[in-house]
């Protein structure tokens, strides 16, 4: 089965699969409204991978939850998100369930809490196919085995009869990837996919995702704080801070020529294996309280390049084709 078999609408021009415009997520709290995502914009084409990076509380996961219709009950959403030319924000529940089943899938951070501990893994995989694809039990079993084989699960047929607690963390994550891909989605959202895994298993999972992306032409949104993960798989990078876009561009550009002080700080904080004894760098201070954001640029209190003009909010502007940033500091002074 190919991805084209699940398409229900014609793609947008230039093969744009997902287009997000002015996405805004606000939560009502006893202390006031909290804006977790503030006017986010990006596009994603079939087969592309977008990395959304930033510290905890930057709005990465809430962006994904908004697209999936999984916000908490006190959340409100604004803006627009079109998938295959169709607006998907605030869809009726039935249409949203169909979309999530057949076209968009999400892998959550902790596979142990995402899998039902009382059901065999095979039953959980088969349930997806029987419910959403109308397969018989026998057909669903064989297709589930094929997908476990596709994600390099050893002894896949035997593993179908096992419970989640009998798997290692890396194997459980492979099960979640297999489950997410069963319906051949056009878009896969991975939220902190490798956080709980050791470095060796992380590398295996990243290699696997790259292979599956090529095989199924699936677009991926990779939500992570691990810049190594982004470097290994992503085509484009969106750097978020306090719910806003700080920088956006091709991954190689953001990594080799970052043009926002926050992006530079994140990259400088990555430990280097080629500099033995080098000082470990950090970004001073803490992420802001979203109820009491600083005036102007939210990164200003922590920024080594802060100027008086930073008391005003910098607009997100293009400074070269395909690259955006929100900063008053001249680009040439940061390179």
Regions found by a protein language model. Name each.
Residues 13-17, 26-39, 70-76, 92-95, ...:
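A short, flexible loop at the N-terminus of ABC-type nucleotide-binding domains that lies
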Residues 13-16, 154-158, 248-335:
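Short catalytic/signature loops enriched in Gly
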Residues 69-70, 189-193, 197-278:
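P-loop NTP-binding/switch modules centered on Walker-like glycine-rich loops
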Residues 74, 88-105, 123, 131, ...:
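ABC ATPase NBD coupling module
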Residues 76-87:
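Conserved ABC transporter NBD signature motif
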Residues 87, 139-158, 267:
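Conserved ABC ATPase "signature" region
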Residues 182-186:
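A short, proline-enriched helix->beta-strand linker immediately N-terminal to the Walker B motif
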């Amino acid at each position: 089965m190919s991805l084209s078999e699940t398409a229900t609408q014609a793609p947008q021009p230039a093969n744009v699969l997902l287009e997000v415009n002015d996405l805004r997520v606000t939560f009502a709290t006893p202390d006031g409204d909290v804006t977790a995502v503030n006017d986010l914009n990006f596009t994603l084409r079939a087969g592309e991978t977008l990395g959304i990076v930033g510290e905890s509380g930057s709005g990465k996961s809430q962006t994904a939850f908004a697209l999936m219709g999984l916000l908490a009950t006190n959340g409100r959403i604004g803006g627009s998100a079109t998938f295959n030319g169709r607006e998907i924000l605030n869809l009726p529940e039935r249409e949203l369930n169909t979309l999530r089943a057949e076209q968009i899938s999400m892998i959550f951070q902790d596979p142990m809490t995402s899998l039902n501990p009382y059901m065999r893994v095979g039953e959980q995989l088969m349930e997806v196919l029987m419910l959403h694809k109308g397969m018989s039990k026998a057909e669903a079993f064989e297709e589930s085995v094929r997908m476990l084989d596709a994600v390099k699960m050893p002894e896949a047929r035997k593993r179908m009869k096992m419970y989640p607690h009998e798997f290692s963390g890396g194997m459980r994550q492979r099960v979640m990837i297999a489950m997410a891909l069963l319906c051949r989605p056009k878009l896969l959202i991975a939220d902190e996919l490798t956080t709980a895994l050791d470095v060796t298993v992380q590398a295996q999972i990243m290699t696997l995702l790259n292979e599956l992306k090529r095989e199924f032409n699936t677009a991926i949104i990779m939500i992570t704080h691990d810049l190594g993960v982004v470097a290994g798989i992503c085509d484009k990078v969106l750097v978020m801070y306090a719910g806003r876009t700080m920088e956006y561009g091709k991954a190689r550009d953001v990594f080799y020529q970052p043009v926002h002080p926050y992006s530079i700080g994140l990259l400088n904080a990555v430990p280097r294996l080629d500099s033995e004894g080098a000082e470990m760098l950090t970004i001073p201070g803490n992420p802001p309280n979203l109820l009491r954001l600083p005036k102007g640029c939210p990164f200003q209190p922590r920024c080594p390049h802060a100027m008086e003009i930073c008391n005003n909010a910098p607009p997100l502007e293009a400074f070269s084709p395909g690259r955006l940033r929100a900063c008053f500091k001249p680009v040439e002074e940061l390179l």
